[in-house]
């Protein structure tokens, strides 16, 4: 299959139109929109309820650790999809590589369990 530079022209035109639309919309709204400022408009709004106290409550590091572990294992599971699509073409060599990959994931998961990273004590 031979690729020509003109084959990419519709893609670049679409990207240019999308970026141009966004830029023109932002510039147009700043010129056309009202610019009245008042104390009532500048107040924080949260579902019509008056805010009380400070909104900056410290979170436990456990939440961030669980979120990072979720993203880590979620991204690794995404690698299973191309393997499943090309399973027949990869043959036994692809199967062995995937077993090694999954065993590394399992070792990492057991390490997390051993370090008690998911316990909420």
From Swiss-Prot:
Annotated membrane topology: Multi-pass membrane protein
Its EC number(s): 7.1.1.-
UniProt xrefs under Gene3D superfamilies: NADH:ubiquinone/plastoquinone oxidoreductase, chain 3
One Pfam family it belongs to: Oxidored_q4
Gene Ontology CC annotations of this record: NADH dehydrogenase complex; plasma membrane
TM stretches of this protein: 8-28, 65-85, 93-113
HAMAP family named in the record: NDH1_NuoA (MF_01394)
Family: Belongs to the complex I subunit 3 family.
Quaternary data: NDH-1 is composed of 14 different subunits. Subunits NuoA, H, J, K, L, M, N constitute the membrane sector of the complex.
Protein name in the entry: NADH-quinone oxidoreductase subunit A
Protein species of origin: Flavobacterium psychrophilum (strain ATCC 49511 / DSM 21280 / CIP 103535 / JIP02/86)
Organism ancestry: Bacteria, Pseudomonadati, Bacteroidota, Flavobacteriia, Flavobacteriales
